[in-house]
Regions:
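Short amphipathic alpha-helices in soluble, non-transmembrane regions
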Residues: 20-26, 82-90
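Short, well-ordered beta-strand segments in beta-rich or mixed alpha/beta enzyme
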Residues: 4-11, 50-86
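Long, hydrophobic N-terminal alpha-helical segment
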Residues: 1-25
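Glycine-rich beta-strand-turn "strand-cap" elements at beta-sheet edges
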Residues: 37-62, 88-117
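Short, conserved, surface-exposed binding loops centered on an aromatic residue
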Residues: 1, 29-30, 60
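Positively charged, small/polar-rich N-terminal and surface patches that mediate targeting and assembly
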Residues: 16-37, 64, 106-107
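Residues that cap or initiate secondary-structure elements
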Residues: 13-15, 77, 114
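A short, structured loop/turn motif at beta-sheet edges
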Residues: 32-33, 74-77, 101-102
């Protein structure tokens, strides 16, 4: 069964073009190292909920937009191998303080699908 990494971040609207460049660089690298799919989505209908919501989860500010992304792998074992290669890839070595989003507010995790259609 496949394995999925999911990510949610808040990106300043003024930095969206920079983030898109980063995503367009990172995606092919993930795929080159063995990911089956790499998807980045920009929030279109993500209201700020009273108790829970995507914007609340990442403490999105008024000038930020929510990005929801996921990467699909063949298995957890494949994900671990792909992730090790991605993290070691010199093309993604960056200064985290210069990223176009606040990584401290990123939420992420690995998931085992239980329904795939």
């Amino acid at each position: 069964m496949s394995y999925v990494d999911g990510f949610v971040i808040a990106v300043p609207k003024a930095s969206l073009d920079d983030y898109k460049k980063l995503a367009n660089t990172a995606g092919p690298i993930w795929m080159e190292h063995g990911a089956l799919s790499y998807v980045e989505c920009i929030g279109d209908d993500v209201p700020y909920g009273e108790l829970t919501s995507f914007p609340r989860a990442v403490q999105a500010k008024d000038d930020e937009i929510v990005i929801f992304a996921w990467v699909v792998y063949e298995s957890r074992q494949s994900r671990d191998a792909v992730m090790a290669k991605v993290m070691a890839d010199a093309r993604l070595k960056m200064d985290w303080s210069a990223m176009p989003f606040d990584g401290k507010r990123m939420i992420f995790g690995g998931f085992q699908p239980f329904v795939e259609l």
